[in-house]
């Protein structure tokens, strides 16, 4: 008769993460105000489901590690992962039914009405693509969440496995939620309290049994914060190439919010975020914040990438006509470089609604948000009737743009999977598109045909200067 295995060891970790960029933890539901609503708990506050965390952590492991830690068809998982609950202004997780005075606090009350980010997909003709307009609800940058992981083992020597799993959270390319290729999902690990228990020891067994399942209650058993140790185990980013853009605006730039206000018909996007001083949170109001949406940078790069790739491989109007092709066949998702780096939503199959040929993007970048008071400027516009010389009825509008003041933007970091750049034409086209931004030849944002969004700067690749000073 086979001996009974005793799983007497428990490895417990309590992790606090902070949203380094806005998060989009989708519920799969639509609402009156947004096409995509975030998931909320019983208190109406954002949270991260345990299944989301389990899937992300599983994806970060090798196949062998997945079967060891998270089970397979032949064995169950050795990991127990809780939901990640939001922290209040005092740094305490809100788990269970919250008191009304806590929900009405200056911090948690901000999560009743969250920002809605507007998106529109632009075609190669410079106009919106049909069905390409959508919006989504997002969680504020700086929001902190707390969750716990328990690893059950029969051998004390398996401690290295759980620590390696925890170190994956520190990877530069680890993202949570949807929109990871559009600027959302980047996190920072704030703390990682840890404890190993041997249940064969009476005192440690009693300590384990006394632990509450509520995240809002501190457990005296956590004695060590192993964050610094995990940093030494942090996985390398050899599979990714890191590019950095350091840009300074020439003058005005405009990343549209999709809304107007009392002063203008068109305004640039601004969002509040949460700032922490120790375990005390405060709200930085949107009027004080500079925001550069990563999706705006990504869209501009996608179009310029297609241009440079077609230039390098000789896709001209004449050559396309000779081959019986149209510009649509070498632009957008049909362009090999665009598909390799930014992915594709696929095509509908001949049988019906199923999408085939879907591919995830291989470029990671995050929204840039910094506490910096931008100078809004109102610009008035009017369209003139060429025959009468007077204003066209309904063609007078005002836009509110941001003035950069010749101050350098926060660094924009882009991670690209190295295997996506193996094709030399794709690599050259990609780096040429990035250089165009630094030269001021590829404006970013809206109103570029009116002179907005011109930036100058430098480009580095894995720390090595490619362009600029």
Where are these regions (language model features)?
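Small/polar/charged residue-enriched interaction surfaces, especially the RNA/DNA-contacting tracks
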Residues: 1-469
